């Protein structure tokens, strides 16, 4: 019978370095006999403090004094010199602080789940009421969203290597032993599983364990996997009414300083799918917004509803209704324009601002922006978008064709006619009726965009382009101002519309600007180079938001 269930231990498999390793290092550091700490910890079974802890009969704070006393008795019995101030809680605190998720192992579990495997964590764990309990909480919070089941000994009252917990695993997952592969870093925990008929893998080295897991499951794990994206069905959705009849939809994850992710055209909150979990795990309350006109947000037909002044006012109301005094704003494409304007017109509400691809360009009060657009060939598509109903008809006719034509990697054949849309009568005129799928998307992701745009059509999204003169007049009110909030500009080497050189004079208006640059990347930055985007954003956020300089920028 083929394998269809993958069960993973936590400590030493999904989390490294292991607590057992911490015991070993502490034995060496304290000049204690080998196995003095680890041996007593393990041989307290049965019915000792550790078994009671792992079965949830006592909590961590109750366990510590019992183990401290046990170690003191053991030290006298064997003549070991235990420090006077010794406490097992210190060793655990250090071990938990040092422990982090074993990313290659997690990615393997995710790959197996994508392939159709049921995945499960089976761990001897404890009820942590200690003062360092947040580290365990954070780890379990992140891991649990990627597995179908979580079996913790302290919650079910059974521990490895007792056979009962393996039977509980099979009953819970409705699986037969020969359908299960089980990974653990202790051979004693694997033996009962193997005796029952499960395939077992002893994890002493992640790389070799993964090679064995590939072999037994017939799955090739990617060498450089993408960040873990969020699933629309597994995230929290919210709505804020910003004025009568108009609401904004958002997806929320994490806790900490508020961070608003704002997408461009023709996209969705879903375009931030690779960033949402990573930023939440980095310590932020992430709110990925469906911009006005998109998805589950309201999509009024009137052009003036999409004027930049109104969009920014509604974003302030969005914060007000959620009780958020300040937020970090990160925008891409059209939303890049919006977040720069938020920093310019509502600096007191902007904790920091970042833009992907879209530079800050102050208006020229003497030159009409439409004249500028007409003078730049690559902006020709924006002229095509001006007449209501025309582009809508083209883009809505076959939305699979539309999104597969738009979402292309920088090294793939480009289809949309940004340079000559008005001349040839459309942006998709030379596009295949059934374009091949880009390597930066999946069929399921394209289908999600299609379903979102079936709700609203393209009228609202295109209206963002139809307020050029109105936006220009409003933005001229900010002439002479500088952006002094923490700011980041991320350029993409191969974006043919928002070219990196367009940002070269930004320091004149944003004197404390930080920069990031991504090579071999086109316009769809968040999905083409998600790892690089996440690294740049998190590094900047940690410096400018979580640990900001106290130096005044005024």
UniProtKB/Swiss-Prot annotation:
Post-translational modification, as annotated: The N-terminus is blocked. The covalent modification of cysteine by 15-deoxy-Delta12,14-prostaglandin-J2 is autocatalytic and reversible. It may occur as an alternative to other cysteine modifications, such as S-nitrosylation and S-palmitoylation.
N6-succinyllysine, modified sites: 55, 176, 371, 420, 454, 504, 508, 553
Positions contributing to Mg(2+) binding: 9, 11, 185
Name of one Pfam family that matches: Abhydrolase_1
Active site: 333 (nucleophile), 465 (proton donor), 523 (proton acceptor)
EC number(s) on file: 3.3.2.10, 3.1.3.76
Positions with a binding annotation for phosphate: 123-124
Tissues where the protein occurs: Detected in liver, intestine, ovary and kidney. Detected at low levels in heart and muscle.
Residues annotated as binding substrate: 381
Induction: Up-regulated during the luteal phase of the stimulated estrus cycle and by compounds that cause peroxisome proliferation, such as clofibrate, tiadenol and fenofibrate.
Residue numbers spanned by region Epoxide hydrolase: 233-554
Keywords: Acetylation, Aromatic hydrocarbons catabolism, Cytoplasm, Detoxification, Hydrolase, Lipid metabolism, Lipoprotein, Magnesium, Metal-binding, Multifunctional enzyme, Peroxisome, Phosphoprotein
Lipidation positions, renumbered (S-(15-deoxy-Delta12,14-prostaglandin J2-9-yl)cysteine): 521
GO cellular component, one term: cytosol
Reaction catalyzed: an epoxide + H2O = an ethanediol; (9S,10S)-10-hydroxy-9-(phosphooxy)octadecanoate + H2O = (9S,10S)-9,10-dihydroxyoctadecanoate + phosphate; 8-hydroxy-(11S,12S)-epoxy-(5Z,9E,14Z)-eicosatrienoate + H2O = (8,11R,12S)-trihydroxy-(5Z,9E,14Z)-eicosatrienoate; 10-hydroxy-(11S,12S)-epoxy- (5Z,8Z,14Z)-eicosatrienoate + H2O = (10,11S,12R)-trihydroxy-(5Z,8Z,14Z)-eicosatrienoate
Entry-linked InterPro entries: AB_hydrolase_1, AB_hydrolase_fold, Epox_hydrolase-like, HAD-like_sf, HAD-SF_hydro_IA, HAD_sf, PGP-like_dom2
Microbody targeting signal (motif): residue ranges: 552-554
Entry remark concerning the domains of this protein: The N-terminal domain has phosphatase activity. The C-terminal domain has epoxide hydrolase activity.
Complexes and interactors: Homodimer.
Family according to the record: Belongs to the AB hydrolase superfamily. Epoxide hydrolase family.
The protein's name: Bifunctional epoxide hydrolase 2
Protein source organism: Mus musculus (Mouse)
């Amino acid at each position: 019978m083929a394998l269809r269930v993958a069960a993973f231990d936590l400590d030493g498999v999904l989390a490294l370095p292991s607590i057992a390793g911490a015991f070993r290092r502490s034995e060496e550091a304290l000049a204690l006999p080998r196995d003095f700490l680890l041996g007593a910890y393990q041989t307290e079974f049965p019915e000792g403090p550790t078994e009671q802890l792992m079965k949830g009969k006592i909590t961590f704070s109750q366990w510590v004094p019992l183990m401290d006393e046990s170690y003191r008795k053991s030290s006298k019995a064997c003549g070991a010199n235990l420090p006077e101030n010794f406490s097992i809680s210190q060793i655990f605190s250090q071990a938990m602080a040092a422990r982090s998720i074993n990313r290659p192992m997690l990615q393997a579990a995710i790959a197996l789940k994508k392939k159709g495997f049921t995945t499960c964590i089976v761990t001897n764990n404890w009820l942590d009421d200690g003062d360092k309990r947040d580290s365990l909480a954070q780890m379990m919070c992140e891991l649990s969203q990627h597995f179908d089941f979580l079996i913790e000994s302290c919650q079910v009252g059974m521990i490895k290597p007792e056979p009962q917990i393996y039977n509980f695993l099979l009953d819970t997952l409705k699986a037969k032993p020969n359908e299960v592969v089980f990974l653990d870093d202790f051979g004693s925990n694997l033996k009962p599983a193997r005796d029952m008929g499960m395939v077992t893998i002893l994890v002493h080295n992640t790389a070799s364990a993964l090679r064995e897991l590939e072999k037994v499951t017939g799955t090739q794990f990617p060498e450089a996997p993408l960040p873990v994206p969020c699933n629309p069905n597994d995230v929290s959705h919210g709505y804020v009414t910003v004025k009568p009849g108009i609401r904004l939809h958002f997806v929320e994850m994490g806790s900490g300083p508020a961070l608003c992710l704002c997408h461009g055209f023709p996209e969705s909150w879903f375009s931030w799918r690779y960033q949402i979990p990573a930023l939440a795990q980095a310590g932020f309350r992430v709110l990925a917004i469906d911009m006005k006109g998109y998805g589950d947000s309201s999509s009024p037909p009137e052009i003036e509803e999409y004027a930049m002044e109104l969009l920014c006012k509604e974003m302030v109301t969005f914060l007000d209704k959620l009780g958020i005094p300040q937020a970090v704003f990160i925008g891409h494409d059209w939303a890049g324009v919006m977040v720069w304007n938020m920093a310019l017109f509502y600096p007191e509400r902007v904790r920091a601002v970042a833009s992907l691809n879209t530079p800050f360009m102050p208006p020229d009060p003497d030159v009409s922006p439409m004249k500028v657009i007409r003078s730049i060939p690559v902006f020709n598509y924006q002229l095509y978008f001006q007449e209501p109903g025309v582009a809508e008809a083209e883009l809505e006719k076959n939305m699979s064709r539309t999104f597969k034509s738009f979402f292309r990697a920088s090294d793939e054949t480009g289809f949309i006619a940004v340079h000559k849309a008005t001349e040839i009568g459309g942006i998709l005129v030379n596009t295949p009726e059934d374009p091949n799928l880009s390597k930066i998307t999946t069929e399921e992701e394209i289908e999600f965009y299609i379903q979102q745009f079936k709700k609203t059509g393209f009228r609202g999204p295109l209206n963002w382009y139809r307020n050029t003169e109105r936006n220009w007049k409003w933005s001229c009110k900010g002439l002479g101002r500088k952006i002094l909030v923490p700011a980041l500009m991320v350029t993409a080497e191969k974006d043919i519309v928002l070219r990196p050189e367009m940002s070269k004079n930004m320091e004149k208006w944003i004197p404390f600007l930080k920069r990031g640059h991504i090579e071999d990347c086109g316009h769809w930055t968040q999905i083409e180079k998600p790892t690089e985007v996440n690294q740049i954003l998190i590094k900047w956020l940690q410096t400018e938001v979580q640990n900001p300089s106290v130096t005044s920028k005024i």
